[in-house]
Amino acid sequence: MPKRDDIQTILVIGSGPIIIGQAAEFDYAGTQACLALKEEGYRVILVNSNPATIMTDKEIADKVYIEPLTHDFIARIIRKEQPDALLPTLGGQTGLNMAIQLHDSGVLEANNVKLLGTELKSIQQAEDRELFRSLMNDLNVPVPESDIVNTVEQAFAFKDEVGYPLIVRPAFTMGGTGGGICYNDEELKEVVSNGLHYSPATQCLIEKSIAGYKEIEYEVMRDKNDNAIVVCNMENIDPVGIHTGDSIVVAPSQTLSDVEYQMLRDVSLKVIRALGIEGGCNVQLALDPHSFNYYIIEVNPRVSRSSALASKATGYPIAKLAAKIAVGLTLDEMLNPVTGTSYAAFEPTLDYVISKIPRFPFDKFEKGERELGTQMKATGEVMAIGRTYEESLLKAIRSLEYGVHHLGLPNGESFDLDYIKERISHQDDERLFFIGEAIRRGTTLEEIHNMTQIDYFFLNKFQNIINIEHELKNHPGDLDYLKYAKDYGFSDRVIAHRFGMTESEVYQLRQDNNIKPVYKMVDTCAAEFESTTPYYYGTYETENESIVTDKEKILVLGSGPIRIGQGVEFDYATVHAVWAIQNAGYEAIIVNNNPETVSTDFSISDKLYFEPLTEEDVMNIINLEQPKGVVVQFGGQTAINLADKLAKHGVKILGTTLENLNRAEDRKEFEALLHTIDVPQPKGKTATSPKEALENAREIGYPVVVRPSYVLGGRAMEIVNSDAELENYMEQAVKASPEHPVLVDRYLTGKEIEVDAISDGETVIIPGIMEHIERAGVHSGDSIAVYPPQTLSQEDIDTLEDYTIKLAKGLNIVGLINIQFVIAHDGVYVLEVNPRASRTVPFLSKITDIQMAQLAMQAIMGTRLKDLGYKQGVQPYSEGVFVKAPVFSFNKLKNVDVTLGPEMKSTGEVMGKDLTLEKALYKGLTGSGVEVKDHGTVLMTVSDKDKDEIVKIAHRLNEVGYKILATQGTAEKLKEDNIPVEVVGKIGGDDDLLTRIQNGEVQIVINTMTKGKEVERDGFQIRRTTVENGVPCLTSLDTANALTNVIESMTFSMRTM
């Protein structure tokens, strides 16, 4: 069938900022879709609020709007651009919900905009729990016993009928937001209240729990001619009860008989046909392990996290083909881009095993509730490919970057068996490693199965891994056992530990005896057809399918799984670096392990190696490919941390030299450099023991900032005010980075400034200076950044320019450098220097039209910036004001304090741009999920040190018509200044302030931290209640001040004559 010719312009809605449940997979999907539509000759308009994406580059669509993803802003774009059609199924749940709102409000009809792909009726049938249940009943497809509720009372009525446990699934949400498993009345009340709050339809499905069933997923495609295929089927190792995004997943399924596989395949195709899906779709099913009974859990009528995984697992580009199906093309007329000869209607076949393991943020949030359920908690994921299940699992484990390298915890021997079993009986992120530990101690597989309901197939595989460990220990240095262990995915590091050797000795033993991996191609067809996909994985077999060319090569290290502190920004930089390498005529090779990203799309680089980012795995590739050099500065701390290890093997690190990378990180060397170039920093010292840290802090004077060196995202960084706090910190921090010392610095309050620069060794260009709204002490990734700076004098800017050039030249930077400064009462100080790409690179690149990562890569390859027409120093400002606002996922993580400080907590970001600061801030705040209202009620409860400052904010909010509530101490201060205020009772009192928040009486909460970070403190409860009820909680008065400016700009002041 020919593609549609009744439409010319298509609007694509992106998924917005990275949050738990909606990560980089939608940048990958959206980028693919936009390029596919342009390929077919359509004009593409893209709207997305996330600047850290490849999708929002000007080259990806004909017009790109970086605006808040709200009904009003998208309606304006529709009225302005007059698109013929809207494609809603590639922007995650956000895009889907937006399309429904635009349809329901009449905007689409009023502007003659058609919906492409799956019809709205079908989307609503899949998303609306009641309609879906009704359709399944018509099809005779079993669904768990359930009820649809709109109130807590209805939920209790259903509970009385069927009893506990119950699963709560809110409608029209993603990542299981607001849902959970309930075992008692208290949990049911809390979860249903939350679920109704987060569901746009105020609707929850409550179903009898089928926890313990196998969870199976089918990723399916269908076109308008009713051609339908299964792209990939996947099995969750964890049974039903844990969100699939938090489950360890294997593809293809390993424990289904052919009868079971075909039965569930038939059901999946029957359901998508009944729904009328056109494009990609994910079907989740539950299968009784002891019979052929099954239930359908849910259907996602859109491209999802699972479809990104299925695309990377098979090589089959789901989002690209879904976009083409949406404009009328059919599966039997589109060629499979992987083979170039077979058609897209052929179902992919796998001759390898895929393992996906989620990456959780609990290294950041040690007090966060680790228990896993139906609400997703992982920030990202890793994928690994192997010829055996054991191989793919062990490769995935060592990709996680938790400091865990194998099926067990580093300190596993120290736990007693009772504790290990206790941990296994709870579903949390470390259960897999405790299972390994239990098997090592002789616990039977039957006992583990009874505790976890994990299939014996997988438990036997874990047992096999432990058996191989024993054999290695019993046969140290034996080449047959070495080769056998490599076949099953063991790393040199683990083998060395069992052999009683060093890792480098095992590496040498392998080299001397030619025990090396070969690289196999991912080709969608198990080598049935000729294929030229440059997409490879390593395994210990005989035939190598990765043909090495004569071309000069540059290898780029990716940034691994998405986590707090290292997000999609680094993937953006990686992709741009690859494009620059290709433009310069080199062969570009990527090594990465994240299935969600654009960089692991095989069409981006000349060769993609989907492998763990470890010394061993990367060196194996380097030994084969012999690149000219390796680029580490675009892959975040993951890649930087490998530089030293690779250099010891004689690998050339391109760009800033290893010596200079280390000078920026080594405290003493960096201080010596600052002294030489005359750039001041806050007084600080290095400590290698708690005793030394205390001596340093007393000498410098409290408050001090303490942090380990060589970390990203402010990991384990804290401001401490006393000996007692410091002693408590040292117990934690030395754990965070044992091989590196702790830095103790004077804490300076003042404006924080961030600068990104590019240097070729001679010329230093500064694309932009960003001013943070929150003063120093809040991590730069959690601050609102403003470009151009709004309150700096020309003298400040000249000083920042001078210091940046001195630092870049002093460190002999070739490529990118990111510097954070503080402007205190007595001048400008340098806080931190990162000799690599930073998370502000995409933001500044979008604003200034300077492709920073590409320019840096050109400098790394020897191009002079002067020859490209750039002059040294700060580049001319772009027109307008641009704001980068952080986005948090606190509503997904229980027991995590929302207070901002030097350790990063945000998962994503949005951009707001306009002609004035207030308008840009309004867009930034709105895009980040803060509903800015011109009237309402604000609750204030601040620490003593902030009481003078809160008076000014309260006065201004009162002037524009806000009602003010405050706790006793804060209220007394406001009353002294004649500000009308209502006193609210303390927690647990008669007029409990938590009740006021829960009842929806409060629109903003301003709460600053009182001493002591313990979960039990009232402040923590206030902040958590605020987040859980979807109310903006501001923990910095600078943010509160900025919000007040925005509210004032929206309203008129009311004063008597």
Curated annotation (Swiss-Prot):
Mg(2+) 1 binds at Q284, E298. InterPro entries: ATP-grasp, ATP_grasp_subdomain_1, CarbamoylP_synth_lsu, CarbamoylP_synth_lsu_oligo, CarbamoylP_synth_lsu_oligo_sf, CbamoylP_synth_lsu-like_ATP-bd, CbamoylP_synth_lsu_CPSase_dom, MGS-like_dom. Pathway: Amino-acid biosynthesis; L-arginine biosynthesis; carbamoyl phosphate from bicarbonate: step 1/1; Pyrimidine metabolism; UMP biosynthesis via de novo pathway; (S)-dihydroorotate from bicarbonate: step 1/3. Its EC number is 6.3.4.16, 6.3.5.5. It catalyses: hydrogencarbonate + L-glutamine + 2 ATP + H2O = carbamoyl phosphate + L-glutamate + 2 ADP + phosphate + 2 H(+). Residues 402-546 are annotated as: Oligomerization domain. It holds the Pfam family MGS. ATP 1 binds at R129, R169, G175, G176, K208, I210, E215, G241, I242, H243, Q284, E298. One of its GO terms (cellular component) is cytoplasm. This is Carbamoyl phosphate synthase large chain. It comes from Staphylococcus haemolyticus (strain JCSC1435).
